[in-house]
């Protein structure tokens, strides 16, 4: 999973050889209708990503943004147009508007907007993704109570259910080491500032 950044071609080359599958995001794809220059740069970035990576068999999904909420109609129109432009360049991949925060089963929702492989239609349902990155971290017996009662069970039979960030944290972070490293730099970045709070 190339999460929040464009994938590394060396990694994709190895993934192609090993038969691994990847999900790629351009990173930073946050359009703003008041910023046409920024929108043009972001559009160019995502188009270049598709042109560069469309020949990699390991790549199965393009995702525009990580965990984006609902967009105003003008912004949503720009996002969907970028997805359509990607489709023209690569008809073979699933293209998602965003990952996570589907609001319910089998309902239309901006979090579910996608374009399917070899299809030009923009769908507002049929793809369900909800993140629980913290998850249980490791398996424990309490997660399975029976064939109809277990962790990640879904009754959603009409959509593809994808838990994109599921139990992503399997060990405690090295917080003291992170703090030491971040304090060496004057600019901490958005996430560095969060880590030091």
Residue ranges: model-predicted function:
Residues 2-197:
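Substrate-binding/catalytic cleft of secreted carbohydrate-active enzymes
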């Amino acid at each position: 999973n190339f999460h929040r950044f464009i994938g590394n071609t060396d990694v994709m080359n190895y993934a192609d050889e090993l038969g691994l599958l990847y999900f790629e995001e351009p990173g930073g794809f946050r359009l703003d209708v008041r910023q046409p220059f920024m929108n043009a740069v972001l559009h160019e970035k995502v188009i270049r990503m598709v042109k560069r990576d469309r020949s990699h068999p390991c790549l199965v999904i393009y995702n525009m943004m990580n965990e984006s909420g609902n967009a105003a109609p003008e912004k949503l129109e720009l996002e969907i147009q970028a997805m359509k432009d990607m489709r023209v360049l690569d008809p073979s991949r699933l293209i998602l508007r965003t990952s996570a925060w589907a609001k319910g089963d089998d309902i239309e929702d901006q979090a579910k907007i996608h374009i399917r492989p070899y299809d030009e239609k923009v769908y507002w349902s049929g793809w369900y993704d909800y993140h629980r990155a913290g998850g249980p971290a490791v398996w424990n017996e309490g997660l399975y109570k029976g064939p109809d009662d277990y962790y990640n069970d879904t009754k959603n039979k009409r959509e593809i259910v994808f838990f994109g960030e599921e139990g992503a944290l399997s060990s405690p972070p090295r917080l003291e080491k992170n703090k030491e490293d971040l304090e060496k730099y004057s600019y901490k970045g958005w996430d560095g500032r969060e880590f030091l709070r």
